[in-house]
Amino acid sequence: KADYVQEVPISLDAPETAPVLCRVSIVKSGHDLNNSIHRPERCLPAQGHFNLTGTKVEVPVEGHGIIRMTKLKSQQNITPDQPQPIILDSMHYYVFIGHRHMTEDHLARTLTDMKDRVLYGVDQRWCYFQISTAYGDKIKVPEEEARKQTERLISQLLSQLVKWDELDR
């Protein structure tokens, strides 16, 4: 895991800036399907996130066109021991990258993995790539600015990290 901070303007009318903190997670799966990676819809509630809503989005990647990702929105009480809760809004983008495949869909990943193991003897060794970003009035980061910054970082990182010539897209 890594944290990435870059200053971005809050508004066109105000000269001040605020950091947009993007948390980057890259997890590689093992050979054992039973102990392999899963999706954040399972992990985030265990970390205190609630009100999860998900959509499929298209994100441009520098020099490689558009990729589909799952985008989740969630809320988290960051003061659980206090009588007055402070609720933080977050967005989470994720995608699974295999030996020859990329998908934003957990079920598609599972079916591809089973088919490739049975028919071709290929273990995809999936990589799970996720970027999470907090936003909202409480931290003075508008949702649209957080989205732009997050998608820009996705583009920058995936354009360098993925072996694009090996993917069947």
Describe the role of every protein-language-model region.
Residues 114-169:
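Long, compositionally biased interface segments
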Residues 1-119:
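Short, solvent-exposed recognition patches
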